[in-house]
């Protein structure tokens, strides 16, 4: 490359797919480009438009969709005008975000933002080249579907389940309208099965396929009626809940609201303290470059929570409802308790609660590494379970409870384990006294004292 090379990179949103949905600005940028990079479906949009106009697409085309590969191609074409094409809009779950971050890392640092008549561009200075990034919006397929069915999307919850995992049941539970990108031929059915499992089968679902194309298809049914249907792998869906529930901001579900049977349950006041001690935080969604791994990672990832000895699932359900982005693994070996957990999960619509049946020490090795763990029962395998947890994540925060004297004595040895793993250790005793009616009077009745240990 010679001195003072100037490379223009257009990051273009191509809309839902039909060339009629391209903006005039996008067409102008594509016409100026000498190199065009993107997934084959996006490249085909521009090629078909050129054919309709009776001219050849004269650019050099590269079929690529991975940010690393695209960044390398851009560097190999220094001094040229490059168009990188993305489906939908570049600001809505688009690869444009990762690519711009990758370019900053690969070729240099941001020099300045330049305002001109065409909008705001970003300049990145490399050793001998200035890369000018020009961002051109497109029409999102989710926006297109909302408009097609005549629904405003300004007050909708917008998410993506394409290439990432989103807690769709929680979003649907708490919002009247949820628009989402999907990926995979069976994903609509899988999401609807999950909604039905957690008691949300009566939610209305609108599915859009091949949006903007001549064979566009829009289907509207209840979630429970879509569990076996197959849709295009790039389908878009809108979930409509006529009776959304307000989201809980603190624990404290009344004990009597749970289906209990004869299975022991962590009581309301203890649950509140345990959840506070766990100190769970939602992920920020902020993506940063990690020098050690050489990858872009979420700075504060979504919590992965174990509830060991989950019983009726009362703690798991409270946690699931509070941590919309996290996943709670409720681990229980007793069949009667597992049956109750399924019933309670359905009652409270806890879509991010995974029920794991089996002995904790046997199932933990196959689970994702936890960020937080509550141990309410351990089946006599406490130390083995602790070793497994710390092997998966030495920084996991663990809260344990004990009622019997035998378990309390066992917990005293945990101080040594905490010291060995260089984590904080704290133990408190909690005694709750509740009022109860005694004829025309009220009396205070003491509950069993509970020991609560926090490690980490």
Residues of each region from the PLM?
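Conserved class I S-adenosyl-L-methionine
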Residues: 284-291, 302-311
């Amino acid at each position: 490359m010679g001195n003072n090379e100037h490379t223009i990179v257009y990051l273009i949103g191509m809309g839902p797919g039909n060339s009629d949905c391209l903006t005039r600005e996008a067409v102008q940028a594509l016409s100026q480009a000498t190199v065009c990079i993107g997934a084959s479906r996006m490249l085909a949009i521009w090629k078909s438009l050129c054919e309709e106009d009776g001219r050849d697409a004269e650019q050099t085309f590269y079929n690529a969709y991975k940010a690393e590969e695209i960044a390398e191609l851009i560097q190999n074409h220094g001094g040229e005008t490059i168009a990188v094409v993305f489906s939908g809009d570049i600001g809505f779950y688009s690869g444009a975000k990762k690519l711009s971050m990758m370019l900053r890392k690969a070729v240099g640092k941001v020099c300045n933002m330049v305002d001109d008549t065409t909008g705001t561009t970003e300049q990145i200075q490399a050793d001998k080249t200035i890369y000018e990034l020009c961002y051109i919006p497109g029409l999102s397929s989710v926006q297109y579907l909302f408009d097609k069915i005549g629904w405003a999307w300004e007050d909708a919850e917008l998410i993506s389940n394409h290439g990432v995992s989103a807690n769709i049941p929680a979003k649907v539970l708490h919002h009247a309208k949820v628009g989402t990108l999907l990926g995979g031929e069976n994903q609509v059915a899988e999401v609807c099965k999950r909604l039905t499992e957690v008691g949300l089968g009566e939610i209305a679902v609108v599915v859009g396929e091949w949006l903007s194309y001549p064979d566009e298809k829009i289907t509207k049914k209840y979630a429970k009626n879509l569990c076996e249907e197959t849709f295009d792998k790039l389908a878009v869906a809108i979930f409509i809940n006529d009776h959304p529930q307000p989201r809980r901001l603190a624990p404290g579900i009344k004990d009597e609201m749970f289906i209990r049977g004869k299975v022991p349950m962590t009581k309301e006041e203890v649950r509140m303290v345990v959840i506070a001690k766990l100190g769970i935080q939602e992920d920020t969604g902020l993506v940063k470059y990690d020098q050690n791994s050489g990858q872009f990672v979420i700075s504060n990832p979504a919590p992965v929570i174990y509830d060991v000895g989950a019983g009726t699932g009362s703690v798991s359900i409270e946690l699931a409802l509070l941590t919309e982005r996290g996943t709670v693994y409720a681990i229980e070996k007793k069949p009667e308790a597992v049956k109750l957990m399924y019933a309670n999960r359905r009652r409270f619509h806890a879509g991010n609660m995974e029920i794991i049946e089996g002995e904790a020490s046997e199932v933990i090795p196959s689970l994702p590494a936890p960020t937080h763990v509550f141990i309410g029962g351990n089946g006599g395998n406490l130390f083995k379970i602790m070793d497994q947890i710390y092997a998966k994540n030495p920084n996991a925060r663990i809260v344990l409870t004990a009622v019997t004297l035998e378990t309390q004595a066992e917990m005293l040895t945990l101080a040594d384990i905490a010291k060995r793993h260089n984590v904080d250790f704290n133990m408190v005793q909690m005694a709750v006294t509740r009022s109860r009616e005694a004829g025309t009077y009220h009396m205070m009745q003491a509950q069993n004292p509970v020991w609560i240990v926090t490690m980490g």
